[in-house]
Amino acid sequence: MKNDCLAKFSVPYEPGRLEAVSYDAQGCELGRCTLTTAGQQTQITAGPEQNTVQAGHLCYIRLRYTDEKGITKPLARGNIKVEVDGGTLVGLGNACPYHERSYLDCVADTYYGEALAIVRAGEGDGLTLTADDGMYSTAVTVPVTH
C-alpha cells in the first residue's frame, strides 16, 4: 500500500456495527470510527449545541432523522419546517454544496438526514424550536440566561 493516508477495503453489508481502528507504526491507536445500523423507527431529533443560551446570542440546533436510539438515518430525507417561540430564526439549511433554498426560509431539505437551525434567543426565560416534516415532529426548549 502506498503511504498516501488512504486505506480502502470492501466489506459485505450486514446489519450491526462496523468499527475501524487506525494504529501507528508502534501499534498505538491513532483513531477509531464506528458505523451502526439504524433501527426501523424514524423520528426527528433536535439537539441544541449547548444546554443554555444567553439572551440575544445565537443557539445552533442540529435537526436529524434518527431511530429510537438516536442513530442518524442518513438516507432519510424530508423538508423540515421550523417554528420558533422565544427567539428569532436567523438561518436554516444543510451542508449540501448545491443547496437551492434561501437560508432565511423556515423550511429546509435534509442532507444525509440532517439540517441545522440557527436561532437568536429572545429576552424570555427560554426558546422553543418545533420541527415538523408532515409525518414526524419534535420540539426542544433551551433555557435563556440573562
Task: Show where each model-derived region lies.
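Short, hydrophobic beta-strand segments
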Residues: 7-13, 102-123
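Short aromatic-acidic-glycine turn motif
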Residues: 41-45, 83-99
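Long hydrophobic segments that form regular secondary structure
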Residues: 1-31, 66
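Beta-strand-rich structural segments
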Residues: 21-22, 56-74, 80, 129-130
